[in-house]
A protein has these predicted regions:
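Amphipathic, oligomerization/interface secondary-structure segments
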Residues: 1-61, 303-548, 569, 573-584, ...
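Short, polar loop/linker segments at the starts of domains and inter-domain junctions
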Residues: 598-602
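N-terminal "leader" segments that precede or initiate the main folded domain
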Residues: 1-158, 163
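Surface-exposed interfaces of beta-sheet-rich extracellular modules
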Residues: 586-589
């Protein structure tokens, strides 16, 4: 451990390094579930349909907020009156519609006005309290508070790219000689934590420079000329987040470009070849950032190893289904625009690409197709990605490389906790121990998969709402960087899985439903097999999982696990299914077991392919 930090500070630092990595796996991207964002998105949605008795997204958003509040022990303890009243109102609306949309809207508006700032300060104080201790008393609670704190910061408008940039200053800048100073910097908790920023944004204009300068003067847009290049000046003392500040001001500067384009044949634009110059009072330095850091998304890409197989399969598909072929080309054309358009436009293009690829399934509504298929496509991949990423971080440079198969062998041994406790990094160890608890118990895994499905669905809904606001209301401020990172992460996995299924089609001839039907049928079949297998491993009645998590369960010591040869994720779960058949029968109602027994052979043949690392 870095001796500059206490145990609690080191935990928070590594939490941030994982969450703010711009190439993080889907499960590491901040989930946005916090008081300020949840209440604000409900208020906004209710305001659009407050007098109309129509089906909208309110119920899904309210249910998500309710579930978040149930887990918020800090809010419950520190502000019990507000917490209880808020929970009661949401429950009344969800369960029985005892209150109208209008009444709920007014109530939530008042709660946000009175309590949003006090809630944030309460969370910040709790973070301060945790960080003030040398040791970590309760790691689960600490991580939960850190999550809430980070989500609140992002929900209040701080760009994740700025937070990522700030990590590079944490260890080296004298302004953050005390770790709490860094925390105050990203949180902007008090006026004295606000920076003074001088920013120069380069402009490319070959002619009509005089006209541009004249318009700048009339619109009170400051500028400087350095080495014959015009720079528009941005000055601000109300924020630390220069990414958001620059993006906001670029909209204003672009209006000057538009005026010149409208009245002349000249096309001024931002000069992406030159860097943006920034001077920060808090950081006490002048520095430059590449222009593309502001206007381009940088993050994960689909796996390049699939490229050549995809090209071959796509060419073969062209011979049998020309409609399918053109749908795929349309998808790729929208996704590719990401490289040539600024983030807000690319956000919409990437949603169109996702809708287009999912609509190949023949579900008419693009949004409904995305909601139905994306969770089924994502879950096994994001679980595998997340575990693998933490294995790399936990073991690289410490011990030998540990792969997913090795990890599963470790967690099925009786002393797995002792083995994992040797991991030096507390946060990485915490994540892998949590995965061990989930994977070691079929019920835990089943419940986790259902929670994960809910998480993906609420992310998709938020992305869709932002897309609609941007497209239909022309609200340029609707774009949020964090949602774009999630959308890109989702799309990359979907396109990978789609082309992998296309490549692996056993029957290369056109089926009577079409190639697209074949591919999406594979996704739903795999999903059904996975859930049915987990049901057989533990219980059959799905509602029991959802309504009661305190049922007596088979003791882990009574579960036989035989490990032979190279173990994969699916082998591990399949061994549970095969070797505990008699034990599992006791937990399956007799009237249902005959049908389940008939399915067992199918499950054993197909389940092996679900979780394997591709």
């Amino acid at each position: 451990m870095d001796k500059r930090y206490t145990d609690s500070e080191y935990l928070f630092k590594n939490f941030l390094l994982s969450k703010l990595n711009l190439k993080a796996t889907y499960l590491d991207i901040p989930d946005n579930n916090c008081f300020y964002l949840c209440i604000s998105e409900i208020i906004k949605n209710l305001s659009l349909n407050i007098e109309k008795n129509i089906n909208d997204y309110s119920n899904a958003l309210i249910k998500n907020f309710y579930n978040c509040l149930i887990k918020d022990s800090l809010f419950r303890e520190k502000q019990p009156a507000v917490y209880g009243a808020l929970l009661s109102k949401l429950k009344d609306f969800l369960d029985s519609n005892k209150i109208s949309k209008k009444e709920l809207f007014g109530f939530l508006l008042d709660v946000r006005k009175r309590n949003s700032l006090s809630y944030f300060r309460m969370v910040f104080s709790e973070v301060e309290s945790i960080l003030s201790k040398e040791t970590i008393n309760n790691i689960d609670y600490s991580i939960s508070i850190f999550n809430t704190f980070l989500n609140e910061i992002i929900a209040r408008g701080t760009d994740i790219r700025f937070l990522n940039f700030s990590l590079s200053e944490m260890d080296t800048n004298p302004a953050f000689d005390k770790f709490i100073n860094y925390v105050k910097y990203i949180a902007e908790v008090n006026p004295y934590n606000k920076d003074v920023l001088d920013i120069l944004v380069p402009i490319k204009i070959d002619e009509e420079k005089d006209m541009f300068i004249e318009i700048c003067d009339k619109r009170n847009q400051k500028y400087e000329i350095i080495d014959d290049t015009i720079y528009c000046k941005i000055y601000d003392r109300n924020t630390n987040d220069f990414f958001t500040l620059i993006e906001d001001q670029m909209v204003r500067i672009s209006s000057i470009f538009d005026l010149i384009k409208l009245y002349t044949y000249h096309t001024p634009e931002f000069d992406s070849e030159l860097p943006i110059k920034i001077k920060s009072k808090i950081l006490n330095k002048e520095f430059e950032i590449p222009f593309n850091y502001i206007i381009r998304f940088t993050g994960n890409k689909p796996y390049s190893k699939h490229l050549y197989n995809t090209i071959t399969s796509l060419d073969a598909a062209k011979e049998t289904d020309i409609k399918f072929y053109h749908q795929v080309l349309n998808t790729l054309s929208y996704a590719e625009k990401d490289l040539s358009r600024k983030n807000s436009n690319a956000f919409v293009d990437n949603w169109i690409a996702l809708e287009t690829i999912c609509s190949i399934s023949e579900i008419k509504s693009g949004y409904e197709a995305v909601q139905f298929f994306v969770p089924k496509i994502l879950i096994t991949t994001i679980v595998r990605q997340n575990i693998t990423s933490y294995l790399i971080k936990a073991y690289k440079n410490y011990f030998k490389d540990v792969k997913l198969e090795d990890f599963l062998k470790i967690i099925t041994s009786e002393n797995y906790e002792e083995t994992l406790n040797k991991i030096p990094n507390t946060y990485n160890k915490y994540i892998l121990l949590n995965w061990a608890k989930i994977l070691n118990n079929p019920l835990n895994l089943y419940q986790y998969i259902n929670r994960l499905q809910d998480k993906i669905n609420i992310d998709i809904l938020r992305i869709y709402i932002l897309r609609n606001e941007y497209v239909h209301s022309c609200n340029l401020n609707a774009f949020q960087t964090l949602e774009f990172y999630k959308l890109k992460n989702i799309f990359n996995i979907v396109i990978d899985e789609f082309f992998r299924c296309l490549t692996n089609r056993k029957d290369k001839d056109e089926s009577h439903e079409g190639i697209g039907f074949d591919i999406f049928n594979q996704f739903t079949y795999k999903w059904d097999i996975m859930l049915k297998s987990l049901n057989l491993m533990f219980k059959v009645e799905e509602h029991i999982y959802k309504s009661d998590t305190t049922k007596i369960v088979p003791d882990r010591t009574n579960m036989t696990i035989k490990l032979e040869g190279n173990l994969t994720y699916s082998d591990y779960l399949l061994n549970l299914l095969k070797n505990n058949n008699e034990i599992l029968k006791k937990y399956i109602p007799k009237k249902d077991y005959k049908q389940k027994d008939e399915d067992l052979g199918i499950l054993e043949n197909d389940f092996i392919n679900i979780f394997t690392d591709i």
